[in-house]
A protein has these predicted regions:
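Signature of extracytoplasmic/envelope-associated structural regions
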Residues: 1-183
Length: 183
């Protein structure tokens, strides 16, 4: 299974060519879910008509082990802001969407999700172990294909994973929360 991502320049439009970055992940649940509505119409054969799809949602989560620089664009999208001198301020107004390709190379099955907004973001810093990141997505469209789209593919980051002892202090409003807060 592969996961690749690209920033969109036009919301909901897959970049062309689809130049993308491979992402390392521990779990990914992007999918399409649909809602069906039962028809109330009855025809002369006295049978109720079949249900129809009346809405679709494109959503899910991507979980990963933290790596320096590998998920900066997704964190910035969650903050609706840009990084400035290694500082990310949440609560901005900069809207950023992504196109994500999920691929199953063994069965030639590829799904491109577009118009993806990062709608949730979580950091898990365990007492022992690797730091985990979770990004929730809501999107506008999914297309399927038997072959991967054309475009340059950048390999996943080779930076080391981060643990609770391999990073400095986590600051909230410029103050360390080490030993005093659960976020």
């Amino acid at each position: 299974q592969l996961g690749q991502i690209a920033k969109e320049t036009v919301i909901g439009t897959v970049p062309s060519p689809f130049a993308r970055q491979t992402l390392a992940f521990t779990d990914i649940s992007l999918n399409q879910s649909v809602e069906k509505t039962e028809s109330a119409s009855i025809t002369d054969n006295r049978l109720q008509q079949s249900s129809m799809i009346t809405s679709a949602e494109y959503s899910g989560e991507l979980s990963a082990e933290a790596q320096y620089g590998a998920y900066d664009d997704l964190m910035a999208a969650a903050a609706f802001n840009a990084w400035a001198t290694n500082v990310l301020t949440f609560g901005g107004t900069t809207r950023q969407t992504f196109s994500v390709l999920l691929g199953y190379t063994d069965i030639a099955n590829y799904h491109t999700f577009s118009g993806l907004h990062v709608n949730t973001f979580g950091i898990d810093i365990p007492e022992a172990g690797l730091i985990g990141l979770t990004f929730g997505f809501m999107g506008t469209k999914r297309t399927t294909a038997a072959v991967a789209p054309v475009g340059t593919i950048t390999p996943a980051s080779a930076n080391p994973r981060m643990s609770n002892i391999s990073v400095g202090d986590l600051l909230v409003d410029g103050v360390s929360v080490k030993g005093t807060a659960c976020i």
